Amino acid sequence: RLFYFYSDYDDQIGNPNFDTKELDFSYSQLFRDSRFSGNDRLDDANQTSVGITSRFINNDDGREIITLSIGQIFYLEDRRVQLESSAFEDTVSNSNIATEIQIQPSDNTWLTTSLLWNSRTDTIDEGGFGVHYQTNNSSLYNLGYRFRRDSVRTLGNTRRDLSQADASIVLPITDRWSVFGRYRYDIEEQYALDEMVGVQYDDCCWMVRLLYQQSVDDQYANELNDQIIVERDYAFVLEFQLKGLGSLGNKAESFLRESILGYEDFE
């Protein structure tokens, strides 16, 4: 697959940044038309992406047993637009080499792994793996791990690497009751990043969800003792839905879909 993307430079120095972030780089990022999430920054780009995908298919049921993907972006111009106006231009001529492997040994089991290889330093900058299992009664089990080398020097001139574990579950208790939860933990810093637990009751005509969540809102360094201070957000979400008419309360469904891989509404 070959993808060329061009976007002219627009001077955005002094423009505020409310909620835009730089997207995590992965194989799928090779073929997106923006490296930012949000609308506070407009890309400047002149680049070509090259990617190769190979699939091994089971002839009996059409299932993709193994899917292998590898690709890279070649930058034809420096990227002048950055999140912060004071940041330097990005002058590297090519991205990391992105690889992804997905294995499906059975109809309800998926194994995934991804790596980002830095060809300039001959190191693996980022990687991860995950296991996704779904039973016939709509139970979901997810387990994952992700690591990343941080190229930014922080307090004490030490390198803070990223190392995170993630687990989530959806478990029907009866035909109408189900529970769900997620726990994401920072192994490097030794604290929980996200915690979520909830319960759902689903009848023929109506449905109600209640969930509790706490997540990291901000973190900063305490210069006196070289420790990380973590500030958290806490929230209860209640949603009541009359099927075919609409819902009352926050949209918990979209949040669950983003938080739990493979989550589906029980209707």
Regions found by a protein language model. Name each.
Residues 1-267:
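Outer-membrane beta-barrel translocator/pore domains, especially the C-terminal barrels
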